[in-house]
Amino acid sequence: MATIPFGYSIHPGDILKSEFMEPLGLSSYRLAKELHVSAPRVNDLVRGKRSITADTALRLSAYFGNSAQFWLNLQNKHDMWVAAKDRSLAKIKPRAKAA
């Protein structure tokens, strides 16, 4: 797996493509057929335009033999990284502790 630069999160679709699909010679179309989902759904995922849902995680885990939690953790890590970049978070003042 490639080294991820500090402060950068890879989209789970990139990991799906580079670590699972490419080594097996799987196209988006073929994976979609194996998962019983639409080809645009898988294509959008590997292009970073769609998130991994619980349903998708279950399908991927059933096909690749890993856990659904693996896929959901990848998505959660990416979502947290994206959300943490929101500059409005810095404007939030902590609530004062009760005396």
Task: Tell what function each PLM region has.
Residues F70-A99:
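Short, charged recognition helix plus adjacent turn
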Residues K49-A62:
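Short, basic-rich loop-to-helix N-cap that marks the start of a DNA-contacting helix
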Residues M21, A32, S61:
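The alpha-helix within a helix-turn-helix
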Residues A2-L26:
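A short, Lys/Arg-rich alpha-helix, primarily the initiator
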